[in-house]
Structures are given as structure tokens and as C-alpha cells.
């Protein structure tokens, strides 16, 4: 299982949140061996450049780490970037059918494909809603 932590390295609490996530991931995926990959980029105002830097729109032949992930922990608010929210909802949530997490999000996170919603705040992590239906 390839897990990508993707976000802004200068955000307060980022390292603490990543550590917290590493502790809870075995509980989210108890039957799988967890292989963690990581990708961190500083903020870019141009979302196209941000996606290119993230390896999503990289030149042919380069590994697209974000698109090969089974789980992505996002450490920024997608609505802050032009087109970023639709990118995650359409390409990651709908097409990839991957678990969908936010870290340090403002507002209510979207549920993942199992209707689970996770919330990571500075110093703590928890499942804020679970709907088994």
C-alpha cells in the first residue's frame, strides 16, 4: 500500500500530524502491509505548477507518485488553489476510489469511499464520523 503525505512543509503542526497519521494507519488498514511514500512541496500560487511539482503532470517517464497512491493525506485546503478541489474530488475520489483524508483542513472534510470522515488537527487525530451503511 502506497501512502502519500502531500502538503505544505511550512504549516505549523505538519510534522506532528504526519507522526500521528503513522500511528493510526495500521488501524485504518489492519490487513495490509503499509509502505509509506511522501511528497512535500512548498505552496505555489499557480495550481498547474503545483500539480506539476507534485508529480501529477510530470513529463513522460517520471513516476507520478500522487496518482499511484492508495491513500493520500492532504495538508492544505484544496479550495485555496484554483481547480485543486475538483482535481481531488474527480480524479482522486471518484476515479481512483482511494481513501480520502484531509489534514489541517478548515471546514468539514469530504467522506472517503466507505463514508468515513477523518479529521487531523494539531496534536490530535480522530475519526469524526463513520457511516457503515
Kindly give the residue locations of the regions a language model identified.
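Short, charged/polar "capping" segments at the starts of alpha-helices
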Residues: 13, 41-44, 81-84, 106-113
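Switch II (G3) loop of P-loop NTPases
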Residues: 37-65
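Inter-motif core of Ras-like GTPase G domains
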Residues: 59-80
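Conserved C-terminal guanine-recognition region of P-loop GTPase G domains, centered on the G4
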Residues: 83-97, 101-104, 114
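Walker A (P-loop) phosphate-binding motif
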Residues: 1-32
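Beta-strand-loop-alpha "switch" segments that mediate conformational coupling across diverse proteins
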Residues: 104-105, 111-133
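Conserved beta-strand segments of the P-loop GTPase G domain that flank and frequently precede/overlap
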Residues: 50-53, 72-78, 99-104, 128
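Short, well-ordered alpha-helix to beta-strand connector turns
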Residues: 46-48, 68-70, 95, 122
Amino acid at each position: 500500500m502506497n501512502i502519500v503525505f502531500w502538503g505544505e512543509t511550512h504549516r505549523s503542526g505538519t510534522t506532528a500530524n504526519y507522526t500521528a497519521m503513522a500511528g493510526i494507519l495500521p488501524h485504518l488498514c489492519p490487513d495490509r502491509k503499509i509502505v509509506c511514500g511522501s511528497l512535500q512541496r512548498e505552496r505555489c500560487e499557480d495550481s498547474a505548477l503545483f500539480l506539476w511539482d507534485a508529480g501529477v503532470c510530470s513529463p513522460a517517464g517520471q513516476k507520478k507518485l500522487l496518482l499511484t497512491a492508495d491513500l493520500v493525506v492532504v495538508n492544505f485546503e484544496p479550495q485555496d488553489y484554483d481547480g485543486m478541489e475538483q482535481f481531488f474530488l474527480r480524479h482522486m475520489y471518484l476515479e481512483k476510489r482511494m481513501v480520502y483524508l484531509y489534514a489541517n483542513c478548515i471546514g468539514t472534510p469530504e467522506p472517503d469511499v466507505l463514508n468515513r470522515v477523518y479529521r487531523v488537527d494539531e496534536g490530535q487525530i480522530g475519526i469524526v464520523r463513520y457511516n457503515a451503511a
